[in-house]
Amino acid sequence: MTLQAAPRSAAAQQREPDLRQEVHDAARRARVAARLLAVVPTGVKDRALHAAADAILAHVDRILSANAEDLDAARAADTPAAMLDRLALNPQRVDGIAAGLRQVAGLPGPVGEVLRGYTLPNGLQLRQQRVPLGVVGMIYEGRPNVTVDAFGLTLKSGNAALLRGSSSAARSNEALVNVLRSALDSEQLPADAVQLLSSADRSTVTHLIQARGLVDVAIPRGGAGLIDAVVRDAQVPTIETGVGNCHVYVHEAADLDVAERILLNSKTRRPSVCNAAETLLVDAAIAEHAMPRLIGALQDAGVTVHLDADEQDLRREYLAMEIAVAVVDGVDGAIAHINEYGTGHTEAIVTTNLAAAQRFTERIDAAAVMVNASTAFTDGEQFGFGAEIGISTQKLHARGPMGLPELTSTKWIVRGEGHTRPA
């Protein structure tokens, strides 16, 4: 995806100032809402989250009907199966979305948490505490659950959300946001704490990520094209969320029963998500007898195996039942390969050798490093902090699954008694 659209019609060019104004007006409303939410007690926000969960379940038929329309349009456009899976909702997934809101409601509120405090020799009392970021702009592709995840986490952390989802999920997102806004209104909280930018025009994204002074951070969540375009064109701070070229490395000291289970779970549990394994690395010392077993298990599970993987294969995020395979020379060969081809998301080693595991964890440059565990565990809920707003693959301001603390900044409170600084 690129934010630079093809040559636009005269009508579209005339509408450009209107779109910019619409985005900026929405951002201003969000800013007002964010200032109100910044001082709302955690208990009030938690009640609103439960109200939103109740409302989603009460309107499940409306939500699924809207999603069915999106799916029909996507199938008519020959959308790949992996993308259809991301787009699809069903009663179980809607139940999970509502449960995610309740889980967030049960988490400690980050706003006001004191990170450190002390008194200086001159008597000044200093305290550093968490405060909301403000207005969070979310740009994401066809995953309606992200709409609700973003709402829940931004509300609990005292932020307002400006959402720009994919046109492929437009009906689903609209239905969900309408339900969420009604829930906020019922709890006497500002409905503008969550707004959907509904225009399909890609310039809407540009206006959002260039709304310096109105939007505090932009978080793109989707494929490499979307993320690269947002980071390149943004004039507001951005947090990159994970393109996931994740590896499973089977070390020479691996238990192959364990390796097979981890590999299959990492690849096949949900191949369309960013924490799915995309490359299998096998230690040269065991390749002759391990490869037939591991490759056979993948093929039996319906995975297309790219044995003669070229440069393009090794850098590819398949998001499907496909995987690249390479043989590496020991743990150092695996580390070198991953640091060359990985995207800094999640990397796994399977081994019974503690020294090899330690070397791997110390030298792999990634947000999450697994030892004898599936890459599928890189997830906010699995990490124990509820839904995530994304998995950051950068090193500032957050890294890994982003929950509530990652949606805050800090403020210093300094208390004195008429203190003045000497000349």
UniProtKB/Swiss-Prot annotation:
Pathway it works in: Amino-acid biosynthesis; L-proline biosynthesis; L-glutamate 5-semialdehyde from L-glutamate: step 2/2
Localization in the cell: Cytoplasm
Gene3D superfamilies in alphabetical order: Aldehyde Dehydrogenase, Chain A, domain 1 (3.40.605.10), Aldehyde Dehydrogenase, Chain A, domain 2 (3.40.309.10)
InterPro entries: Ald_DH/histidinol_DH, Ald_DH_C, Ald_DH_N, Aldehyde_DH_dom, G-glutamylP_reductase_CS, Glu-5-SA_DH, GPR_dom
Biased composition (Low complexity): 1-14
GO function terms (MF aspect): glutamate-5-semialdehyde dehydrogenase activity; NADP binding
Function summary: Catalyzes the NADPH-dependent reduction of L-glutamate 5-phosphate into L-glutamate 5-semialdehyde and phosphate. The product spontaneously undergoes cyclization to form 1-pyrroline-5-carboxylate.
Annotated segments matching region Disordered: 1-25
Protein name: Gamma-glutamyl phosphate reductase
Gene Ontology biological-process annotations: L-proline biosynthetic process
Species for this entry: Mycobacterium ulcerans (strain Agy99)
Pfam families in UniProt: Aldedh
Catalysed reactions, as listed in the record: L-glutamate 5-semialdehyde + phosphate + NADP(+) = L-glutamyl 5-phosphate + NADPH + H(+)
Biased composition (Basic and acidic residues): 15-25
The keyword NADP is assigned to this record: yes
Family listed: Belongs to the gamma-glutamyl phosphate reductase family.
Keywords: Amino-acid biosynthesis, Cytoplasm, NADP, Oxidoreductase, Proline biosynthesis
Record GO cellular component, one term: cytoplasm
The enzyme's E.C. designation: 1.2.1.41
Main localisation: cytoplasm
